Design a protein with these regions (language model features):
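Short glycine-enriched loops at secondary-structure junctions
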Residues: 94, 117, 144-146, 193
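N-terminal Rossmann-like NAD(P) cofactor-binding module of classical short-chain dehydrogenase/reductase
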Residues: 98, 140, 189
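Short acidic, glycine/Ser/Thr-rich loop/turn "cap" segments at secondary-structure junctions
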Residues: 105-112, 136-143, 180-184
């Protein structure tokens, strides 16, 4: 997949969706929300219990304007249902698992279906194109590849665009700088603080970033 009609110097990855009118977006979001509420009510015991306690049924959620009717989900809920208790599909449909670092307790676990990965990749592709990324770019990914979703999300998004992805991953700043120079990277994907650190390191080497 080389993108949806993506050509050089385009502003959109999926122009039809990204330029939808407010009314069209309201309809798209509301339709997706009502389907998702029905799915989690039927498949996630905690969500069903919370909605019943609040006197809410799936049919009461008709649009995004009804979001305020829904009860909150708390961090402790994710810990109490660790690892798979919040999944709304069977494990047979889960093709990948990502998770937070768990620095404050148990990690937050997210299961991805094949469709989830496709949707996530397109969402990130839209963001990359909106930031100016094109098919002829070399994308240097400095996010970690592992349980954190950042590296892989950007990796697959870059491939959807049709750009060349360089999966450097995190750490070893000297190596990062060498690859940025030698491979002709034109897009750097990393945290803002790490981009500044790379710039500072270059200045220390007498190079204007």
């Amino acid at each position: 997949n080389k993108g949806i009609g993506l050509t050089f110097m385009t502003k959109y990855y999926n122009e039809q969706v990204e330029t939808a009118s407010r009314d069209q977006m309201f309809y798209i979001q509301s339709l997706a929300l009502t389907r998702k509420i029905k799915q989690v009510y039927e498949n996630v015991p905690l969500y069903r219990q919370r909605m019943q306690e609040a006197g809410i049924e799936p049919g009461d959620i008709c649009s995004v304007e009804d979001l305020s009717k829904l009860p909150f989900t708390y961090k402790q809920d994710l810990r109490d249902t660790y690892p798979y208790g919040m999944f709304a599909v069977s494990m047979d449909e889960v093709v990948r698992i990502h998770a937070s670092s768990g620095t404050t307790g148990k990690p937050t676990v997210v299961g991805y279906t094949k469709r989830d990965i496709e949707m996530w990749s397109e969402c990130v592709a839209r963001a990359l194109v909106a930031a100016g990324t094109q098919k002829n770019d070399y994308i240097h990914v400095s996010y970690g590849y592992g349980l954190f979703t950042g590296g892989l999300g950007l990796h697959y998004a870059g491939e959807l665009i049709g750009a060349t992805v360089i999966p450097v991953s995190s750490g070893n700043t000297a190596r990062q700088i060498q690859i940025l120079r030698d491979f002709g990277s034109s897009v750097l994907c990393c945290t803002p603080s790490y981009a500044l650190y790379i710039a500072d390191t270059l200045r220390e080497q007498g190079v204007d970033p």
